[in-house]
């Protein structure tokens, strides 16, 4: 035994000589509270770097008008400026962003703490000035703001003149999998709006097979007034992530006044923490085409003044949601990877102000804003340990494929096929959430599709589905949601969650139901996605094989709901769902811990 231990220690001591490959350093943190914040003021992660009144923020005039200027007449292709080497910005300067600035494969853009970039677009120029920052596959961006010196990318307009859509946005294209097809592959799908960029037909294509792909670091960043409409009804999101892999670091990002979605993921599996969507236009957090990352601690706040103007369009109307999630466009194709992202500890504030009723808001707001979460088109989205308040309806399970993904017995009898999804890892999870305001939300006599809590698609049998899914959300037990435990009035849940405030406070008040109710260990989706040092110390050898392993597949010997692989500090470096194996080709040599069915086993990669 002593000899084996010495050999193990000797092996571990040699692992430091190998070059580190990019891999996820994400770890879910177990909390007792639900929502984004605890009651502890000193632990308020929104302090120092956020700005909830960017229309009136004072920023310096640009002092560098060339480094990030894609409209210079001296460029080979006017309209875009390529970064092919390492370019490091200087935080003592204020940069003007015009045209596309494109970080090509092999290039790197480093934006240090405290840097301010002011963006100016012009779709009437020739060529068009799209004022956007694009990171291509193989390129890297390193945004390294801090809690006291964030990086800010904002409008170039003056105080009081800034508005949604003043510039494009930040778009990152990675090599991770998604479920869109481009002919026979999924490696060259182009982001929306770029197909008619006349001077570069191949810009912003994403996808590949590297789930651990590394596009860089995005840390302590504010994105303000993005969402330029490249074409009619084709606005750019505040932050767009296409096929971005788990090797990318993403945390502490505030998107304010986006002219489309604040955040949107197209496939990929990048993990994140501490995201804020402030007064966006369409959806706060939109997941599509096989996105399967883990996300913890986030805030979404709606203002009734800002909504998607196509809500009443005769063709393809779009309403503004908190979460919107799709697997693929039809909702019927069984394409993989599945959209199965996890969002835990989110605080979602709808357009109905605290103390008001849905009936009190104007008719346009009633029509434009709909749900706290819309899960549709065969998505398996998971939203847990979160707060929802002030919405018209709180959850919509839209379409039979997503109704089936609930695996709720009385709902399964109403869809075809009526069998449960193959394994529970494809099952939607909406559990341990605090939901406030259903009794004063949307109600209308005789409506068979919505009741203020749950909504279903308008179709044959909608009333039966509504009844079944209402029961699904009201299940009791360790995964129960708290529904209307307190009145929707000031001082019952959060300190100051109003969108009208320029200094909101999303911490729970004394006695708030948000102070408790989170559950990680009993949720079959979550219980393999976090660990602690006690579990690592108590790890016992179990029959995963081969072990040790050099590369290829690690086999579990059975199908598992989910798995997590952790490094020695307890950081989650790889995870997956609905599988009997894990690919470990991109793991650095060393000692790891694999968690299956709530139990931890040692793994050596050599």
For every predicted segment, state its role.
Residues 1-24, 531-533, 555, 591-600:
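Bacterial Sec-dependent N-terminal signal peptides
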Residues 8-12, 20, 117, 536-540, ...:
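N-terminal cationic amphipathic segment used for targeting or macromolecule association
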Residues 15-17, 86, 532-534, 551, ...:
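N-terminal compositionally biased, intrinsically disordered segments and leader/signal-like regions
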Residues 21, 513, 569-571:
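Residue-level recognition of short loop/turn positions
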Residues 23-530:
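Beta-strand/loop edge motif enriched in small/polar residues
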